[in-house]
UniProtKB/Swiss-Prot annotation:
Gene: MT-CYB
UniProt record, GO biological process: mitochondrial electron transport, ubiquinol to cytochrome c
Function: Component of the ubiquinol-cytochrome c reductase complex (complex III or cytochrome b-c1 complex) that is part of the mitochondrial respiratory chain. The b-c1 complex mediates electron transfer from ubiquinol to cytochrome c. Contributes to the generation of a proton gradient across the mitochondrial membrane that is then used for ATP synthesis.
Stated family: Belongs to the cytochrome b family.
List of residues binding heme b b566: H97, H196
Cofactor(s) the record lists: heme b
Subcellular location per the Swiss-Prot or TrEMBL entry: Mitochondrion inner membrane
Entry protein name: Cytochrome b
Keyword Transmembrane helix: yes
The organism of origin for this protein: Megasorex gigas
Further information: Heme 1 (or BL or b562) is low-potential and absorbs at about 562 nm, and heme 2 (or BH or b566) is high-potential and absorbs at about 566 nm.
Binding site for heme b b562: H83, H182
Protein's membrane topology: Multi-pass membrane protein
């Protein structure tokens, strides 16, 4: 009798995606982050669901309801900090996943890559709205500053901002709609992740060499299921270490002060995972220019396949491109640091130079270097 796993309509889909899936025999631990992102999403949806049972999306009670979760709900503190630090783990995995894609040329799977960029935007939107919900000082002022950026859009800008706010300032209407969107978006992300996977399985996975791997495939289970479980255990270890030893390490102390529209915090800054984009935004003195640079800093990923001038797919055998890639990583870390600093000398000029380098590397230096490598290899 044939195995039910291969015949049952539902189990067949799972089987073809996670069990009998032919995978390249040489994919490294950099290929673990897809499954880790799936685990992060599940953790966020589950913890978020339990938080939503006790949270109230009202300006007068939102802050107190979060305090109530931490003090009075059984293991509420654990659920809350798992959710907050789970977001940080989510972004660490996201950045590593995208970095892997750039390094090994995975962006040449166009559909998978474009859905991935869309997913990145969706996760960033979700995280931003989630940060507003505790209604602390940084929640309120972060929401005010970031939504206000839309007023830079010519002609419709100010109307658009008021439409998003649901009034003339960030208030009850804003908080309620942000909660509604924050609740629904993770499910949209889950659906998009399914489409992401669907497109990936049309082509099969890339591998570190960037060469065709059809001649040497192995079944996903047990080889990569075991490998993924190791990754998951390490992820959970890091997450629990954060949650149980220093849950507020990545947060902002200002968010333990209830939101007050009459008192602006000295340094308004977003969560650490947005700091690189925030630094790029601040490095341009013009409002519209800053907003465009902010959006383009992530939207530029869409252009990755168009900027691929190398004859080889992966950077594995391209040492010059490798050097530039790691310079880009260092540049992003510099931008992240600058985003958390006050707007004063020498941080302004460092931020501006790092922003220029970011765009120049991606748009000019890396494509030209790839062409140079083609010539050096006589391709």
């Amino acid at each position: 009798m044939i195995n039910i796993r291969k015949t049952h309509p539902l189990m067949k889909i799972v089987n073809n995606a996670f069990i009998d899936l032919p995978a390249p025999s040489n994919i490294s631990s950099w290929w673990n982050f897809g499954s880790l992102l799936g685990i992060c999403l599940i953790i966020q949806i589950l913890t978020g669901l339990f938080l939503a049972m006790h949270y109230t999306a009202d300006t007068t009670t939102a802050f107190s309801s979060v305090t109530h979760i931490c003090r009075d709900v059984n293991y509420g503190w654990l659920i809350r900090y798992l959710h907050a630090n789970g977001a940080s783990m989510f972004f660490i995995c996201l950045f590593l996943h995208v970095g892997r894609g750039l390094y090994y040329g995975s962006y040449l799977f166009m559909e998978t890559w474009n859905i991935g960029v869309l997913l990145l935007f969706a996760v960033m939107a979700t995280a931003f709205m989630g940060y507003v919900l505790p209604w602390g000082q940084m929640s309120f002022w972060g929401a005010t500053v970031i939504t206000n950026l839309l007023s830079a859009i010519p002609y419709i800008g100010s109307d658009l901002v008021q439409w998003i706010w649901g009034g003339f300032s960030v208030d009850k209407a804003t908080l309620t709609r942000f909660f509604a969107f924050h609740f629904i978006l993770p499910f949209i992300i889950a659906a998009l992740a399914g489409v992401h996977l669907l497109f990936l399985h049309e082509t099969g996975s890339n591998n570190p060499t960037g060469l065709q791997s059809d001649a040497d495939k192995i079944p996903f289970h047990p080889y990569y299921t075991i490998k993924d479980i190791l990754g998951v255990l390490l992820l959970i270890l890091v997450l629990l270490s954060l949650v149980l030893f220093s849950p507020d390490l990545l947060g902002d102390p200002d968010n333990y002060t209830p939101a007050n529209p009459l008192n602006t915090p000295p340094h308004i800054k977003p969560e650490w995972y947005f700091l690189f984009a925030y630094a790029i935004l601040r490095s341009i003195p013009n409002k519209l220019g800053g907003v465009l640079a902010l959006v383009l800093s992530i939207l530029i990923l869409i252009a990755a396949p168009l900027l691929h001038t190398a004859k080889q797919r992966s950077m594995m055998f391209r040492p010059f491109s490798q050097c530039l890639f790691w310079i880009l990583v260092a540049d992003l870390l510099t931008l992240t640091w600058i985003g958390g600093q006050p707007v004063e000398h020498p941080f302004i000029i460092i931020g501006q130079l790092a922003s220029i380098l970011y765009f120049t590397l991606i748009l000019v230096i890396m494509p030209i270097t790839s062409l140079l490598e083609n010539n050096l290899l006589k391709w």
